[in-house]
Amino acid sequence: MRADEYAFFEPPFIAFAHRGGAMYSPNLGRENSLQAFAEAVALGYRYLETDVHATADGVLIAFHDSKLDRVTDRRGAIAKLTYEEVSRAKIHGIDDIPRFEDLLTSFPDARFNVDAKSAGSVDLLSDLIIAHGAQDRVCVNSFGIRRLHRLRKRLGSKVASGASGLAIAVYRFAPQLTKIINTRAPVLQIPMEQKILGVRLRVLTPALVQAAH
């Protein structure tokens, strides 16, 4: 399917606010916080990017890393902590870690591009999307191909999803094959370049762009 066949892409967009606009100066150090997302929305962003992890007791939180250490005032692996324990941590020593559900309810007009970072997050994410009727507001993705396949299976074909790493490799190295191989994704989420075995490889090429369109 093409991207324009998904309701997710109906509002025109220029850019995503990555982790809630983490590089915008008022948000520095406050990535994936409600405050960061609110700043992005106030700037006019309709599309927001985030990541999700599951706590030990099955609460889905918007957080990039598997551990609290880098951006909060506490330490520990999220998958081994209860939500009560995680909720004591403050992003940049200031902000609460939001649940993904909090993002859906706090920003009802926003679209979310969500990366399921752990196996435990997949069913929780799909359940929340369905419970909130947010199928048109969310695009799901995961670097783990099994996680991505399970998301697609549980959410169905009407929910937009990103291409797998294998599909991206086909677009990059054998774009002619995309005419006969169904990548099952309307979205290619790629870096400009990627470092592989110490060598910087250009990912975004004219041939890839042409194949994607």
Each language-model region and where it sits:
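Phosphate-group recognition and catalysis centered on beta-loop-alpha active-site segments
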Residues: M1-H213
